[in-house]
Amino acid sequence: MSRTAVAILSTENLLHNLKVIKEKAPQSKVIAMVKANAYGHGLRSVSSRLERHVDMLGVASIDEALILRKIGIQIPIILAEGVFEPNELLVASTEGFHVVFHEEAQLQWLANLSCPLPIQAWLKLDSGMGRLGFNIDKAPGFYDQLSKSPQIAQPIHVMSHLACADDPKNPLNQQQIDAFNGFIKGISGKGAYSLCNSAGVFQYPVAHHHFVRPGIALYGASPILGKSAAELNLKPVMTLQTSLISIKEMAKGTPIGYGARYLCPEDMRVGIVAFGYGDGYPRTARDGTPILVNNTRCKLVGRVSMDMIAVDLSPCPHAKVGDPVILWGNDLPIEEVAAFTENVSYDLLSGVQNRVKFHWTRYINTSTNGF
């Protein structure tokens, strides 16, 4: 029998979250971000489920975009990090990918090539993130350069990225919004504008513009500090489930796991769970990290190992070998788990390893003990 670790993924919840996002930004089109293997949920599976419901898909590399074309995805795809070398411009031209231009070298590559078809271009501004994008003071010149290029389809689109939208109290948010608005008011183009990520969708309706670019919210995790996914009416797409493979009666003072970090404070039942950091569970998880056994809240004890973790079964005295264990997802918000680690929900979702089986279903049902 194979390992029982499985990621149960809900199409219903994915589409529910998209509906919530559309209700928050009713005048905007949606670029669904499926980069990084759709935040760990499966690039192909997520994209095929979203294709009929969104306007574009967003990826980080041309390799991801080509995978989507290979499986028959026909809607526009945007390369959010642009191209990494000159020949990728030729591929983007042929395949009809939208390309983000954020670096002067990319414009030089463009000038030295003869693309088969005009490229749909997005100029990226660094409005305060300090990452990719042209500085605001120099961006008008690069915008004009793209506008005059015969290899670029007109009009030129413009985007930027909010650095602190998850924290509504941070003054940088309004500074970035003002900088972005100032730039687009100064150009005469008729292209589309995009500024908001998931957090921006919920926090800054005045900045929604033509396109919003939700990522983590699509997958049912909260993008906002201090607010749960449930408060935002988001539902987890992934429920990570496994099972108990051993139950031990431990005497008071018995150490558990590598480094003997945890010493049993009393005689207790401890369950061994078939999941570890080799599957994607965070090695930094502390004692007390919540885990559901038979839908009962229990606590992690001892250090996470590659293939196993241990759990205090005191709240679940009738647990037996084979009983289901939920590590995050349905009834156990991933943000709550992340709070006991040195990670955030993004890390946990995108870190699930390929030895975990993925099973898509319309309705999540974790009450059965079958895999």
PLM feature segments, named:
Residues 2-11, 15, 64, 83-86, ...:
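Active-site anion/phosphate-binding pocket segments in diverse small-molecule metabolic enzymes
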Residues 5-9, 13-16, 23-194, 208:
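Active-site-proximal beta-alpha core segment in soluble small-molecule metabolic enzymes
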